[in-house]
Amino acid sequence: GGWGRSRFHDALPVECLQHDALVESTAGYAVRCRLPEHPTVRGLDWSTVPPLLGFNECRVREGGDCVVEIENQGRRHPLLAERRLGAGRVTCWMTGASPHWGINFMKWPDYRRFWSQLFNPQT
């Protein structure tokens, strides 16, 4: 948390909310890939992603892409967002990579491949 107040705020592909934007549930939230041909997620089976237990609510910034989204009470929120910046890219993963929110996600068969592609996208 706190990215909206950090030095990186203007570089992010999302706009962080000014209030406590942590959303949690023991039932979990459904995940859906919006851009399956995006280099970061190409070839991953998003239909098998188990529900995530929480995320940081935000909005996609102008010029950013929502690659993967998460649903809460009928509303969709960015889960994986990305934007080009200079010669590179900035990516935000709006949930945890640790067992707290991601315990189910860590059991996803494509978990390792996801992280590998996140840092080394297929071109």
Describe the function of each predicted region.
Residues G1-G74:
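An acidic, glycine-rich "communication" segment
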Residues W3, L80-A81:
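Mature catalytic domains of secreted/periplasmic carbohydrate-active enzymes
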Residues G64, V90-T91:
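A broad, low-specificity signal marking well-ordered, structured residues that form hydrophobic/aromatic
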Residues V68, A81-R84:
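Short acidic-hydrophobic surface loop/beta-edge motif
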Residues V68-E69, C92-M94:
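Short beta-strand segments
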Residues G74-H77, R84-R89, T95-T123:
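Extracellular ligand-binding/catalytic regions of CAZymes and related secreted enzymes
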